[in-house]
């Protein structure tokens, strides 16, 4: 019997299931566990290779007949903000995002619940309990944290924190070459503020301030309206069979 060192990743393939993005398609994923002393290094390598993280799992699409899911990352230093994106930043100038430890809180879950019910009522996460949410946030062996967005208060310029309940939240991994937005959610009743776009713009600024070259956005899915927004942050690089390809 061949033995494998505990730190050597083992990869597995899921059974086919309905694709959540493209009607009539089936998805399969290849995945491995991010555990042990090499979890952080493995997450770095796999993210650069097009994997995404969910708790202690790293996965990427391995569909048999479709290649629509494409990993994308924004080129931070060269990012060219558009007029509409600049207006979104101005519209949300009253918000401040604070990095916090990846610890769940009841006010986060309340916002998460409202977001799911309003935006993804037919999705696979809709039945997540408060315990499920806590595991999504806490269950990690990599360098990760929350960025919690609240309204600015009179003392926010002093202590860097907002006031009141969270308006938006992003679970963010810190990599050697960038930030990775693992999962984000926001107040569904504030649609006019374009909070999803705002958080991406804010994370581009955060990556630039840290001297990191990329912001990883996950998968852009050609043909899916849900994922069209990811193509609007340019220049970006898309992971193709020949490697990362720049798109202006």
Swiss-Prot record:
It catalyses: N-terminal L-glutamyl-[protein] + L-leucyl-tRNA(Leu) = N-terminal L-leucyl-L-glutamyl-[protein] + tRNA(Leu) + H(+); N-terminal L-aspartyl-[protein] + L-leucyl-tRNA(Leu) = N-terminal L-leucyl-L-aspartyl-[protein] + tRNA(Leu) + H(+). Its EC number is 2.3.2.29. Keywords: Acyltransferase, Cytoplasm, Transferase. It comes from the Bacteria. It is an enzyme of class 2 (transferase). GO terms for biological process: ubiquitin-dependent protein catabolic process via the N-end rule pathway. It is found in: Cytoplasm. GO terms for cellular component: cytoplasm. Pfam families: ATE_C (PF04377), ATE_N (PF04376). One of its GO terms (molecular function) is leucyl-tRNA--protein transferase activity. Functions in the N-end rule pathway of protein degradation where it conjugates Leu from its aminoacyl-tRNA to the N-termini of proteins containing an N-terminal aspartate or glutamate. Belongs to the R-transferase family. Bpt subfamily. This is Aspartate/glutamate leucyltransferase. It comes from Methylorubrum populi (strain ATCC BAA-705 / NCIMB 13946 / BJ001) (Methylobacterium populi). The gene is bpt.
